[in-house]
Curated annotation (Swiss-Prot):
The modification Phosphoserine is found at S2, S46. The gene is STRADA. Keywords: ATP-binding, Cell cycle, Chromosomal rearrangement, Cytoplasm, Nucleotide-binding, Nucleus, Phosphoprotein. The lineage of its organism: Eukaryota, Metazoa, Chordata, Craniata, Vertebrata. It is linked to A homozygous 7-kb deletion involving STRADA is a cause of a syndrome characterized by polyhydramnios, megalencephaly and symptomatic epilepsy. This is STE20-related kinase adapter protein alpha. GO terms for biological process: activation of protein kinase activity; G1 to G0 transition; protein export from nucleus. Changing Y185F: Suppresses STK11/LKB1 activation without affecting complex assembly. Residues 310-347 are annotated as: Disordered. Pfam families: Pkinase.
């Protein structure tokens, strides 16, 4: 009799046994504050949101059976080409979803363990601004993860295809508010996200903001006690290096904590406002030195770019640097409007500049917490819910598909979406 268990069977047992038996218990365990924990509690608004948002309100779960899903077209690859992302239709309701299929036979044991951690976190977390997994199951030798299709794609998709010089400030405020609410919850649960960036911010057809990238989350709780710092370097993190804080990149004995995510929020704010991530295309060693030496990215506008540079063509400006003290040569980039003026001839509010400066403090202790940032003056301009305001602010962008929740069995036009879907960097979504 063989005691060897295949990787698909091992993860199948883990999914069925651990999630069913320990799911609710884990929600209670990690939701409690560890003894002696003196960290700041979440603000009242966030706490109310967490308390009132029941598991049933996240989204109805789908049946964990491959036959319930009609795979329509491949819209992306990822996880070192072991993952295929499909647009699919959930047959019982006709709703269009995203199905992420991972070939477990080709995964190393380390990858399987990595995936187990992601699935555990997906069951543990329950928040309106965190992407919910509608179903997770094994089909043949593949792990299937089902999520709702995000019709606006990611924030990175938006800046790559429509807002090449950056988004408007109010839209960014709505997006970052959703991200900070998710981070406030994640930190309250004792985790560090470690992968906040525009491609991990998804926007649904109705303008709701979701934070994804759960695969990189790390628990700061060990043996029931919250650790002051952690030292683990994120696996498979090559694509996220520009967003990582100096203390994470430094990998020394001082370690890092949840404040490292706040630095990533600051970098993401610059990414959304400038149309590209700071430290873009910079070698990893140089990037580390820049961050350790205190080089701080900024919002590119009339207050940070010298007036003489604003009269130059974009090809001779700081357009692609994201750093206020460097002059780079780059190819011209299209602007949002028809005006021939410099794309960064604009002015962001002092509140937005201060918000970014606070997030990018070199000393982690000087950075505000997520709950504190939610009360920052930058967000005072928000007057409506994101679901009401964001679709208007994203115009002329329209959702890629309006099939979400449809009961129709008619697929006419669905394959006409393929061209648009291929423009999305779905392999970066990481749900």
């Amino acid at each position: 009799m063989s005691f060897l268990v295949s990787k698909p069977e091992r993860i199948r047992r883990w999914v069925s046994e651990k999630f069913i038996v320990e799911g609710l218990r884990d929600l209670e365990l990690f939701g409690e504050q560890p003894p002696g924990d003196t960290r700041r509690k979440t603000n009242d608004a966030s706490s109310e949101s967490i308390a009132s948002f029941s598991k049933q309100e996240v989204m109805s779960s789908f049946l964990p059976e491959g036959g319930c899903y009609e795979l329509l077209t491949v819209i992306g690859k990822g996880f070192e080409d072991l993952m295929t992302v499909n647009l699919a239709r959930y047959k019982p309701t006709g709703e269009y979803v995203t199905v992420r299929r991972i070939n477990l036979e080709a995964c190393s044991n380390e990858m399987v363990t990595f995936l187990q951690g992601e699935l555990h976190v997906s069951k543990l977390f329950n928040h309106p601004n965190i992407v919910p997994y509608r179903a997770t199951f094994i089909a043949d030798n593949e792990l299937w993860v089902v999520t709702s299709f995000m019709a606006y794609g990611s924030a990175k998709d938006l800046i790559c295809t429509h807002f090449m010089d950056g988004m408007n400030e109010l839209a960014i405020a709505y997006i970052l508010q959703g991200v900070l609410k998710a981070l406030d919850y994640i930190h309250h649960m004792g985790y560090v996200h470690r992968s906040v960036k525009a491609s991990h911010i998804l926007i649904s057809v109705d303008g709701k903001v979701y934070l994804s990238g759960l695969r990189s989350n790390l628990s700061m709780i060990s043996h029931g006690q919250r650790q002051r710092v952690v030292h683990d370097f994120p696996k498979y993190s090559v694509k996220v290096l520009p967003w990582l804080s100096p203390e994470v990149l430094q990998q020394n004995l001082q370690g890092y904590d949840a404040k490292s995510d706040i630095y990533s929020v600051g970098i993401t704010a610059c990414e959304l406002a400038n149309g590209h991530v700071p430290f873009k295309d910079m070698p990893a060693t140089q990037m580390l030195l820049e961050k350790l030496n205190g080089t701080v990215p900024c919002l590119l506008d009339t207050s940070t770019i010298p007036a003489e540079e604003l009269t130059m063509s974009p090809s001779r400006s700081v357009a692609n640097s994201g750093l206020s003290d460097s002059l780079t040569t780059s190819t011209p980039r299209p602007s949002n409007g028809d005006s021939p003026s410099h794309p960064y001839h604009r002015t962001f509010s002092p509140h937005f500049h201060h918000f970014v400066e606070q997030c990018l403090q070199r000393n982690p202790d000087a950075r505000p917490s997520a709950s504190t940032l939610l009360n920052h003056s930058f967000f005072k301009q928000i007057k409506r819910r994101a679901s009401e305001a964001l679709p208007e602010l994203l115009r002329p962008v329209t959702p890629i598909t309006n099939f979400e929740g449809s009961q129709s069995q008619d697929h006419s036009g669905i394959f006409g979406l393929v061209t648009n879907l291929e423009e999305l960097e779905v392999d970066d979504w990481e749900f």
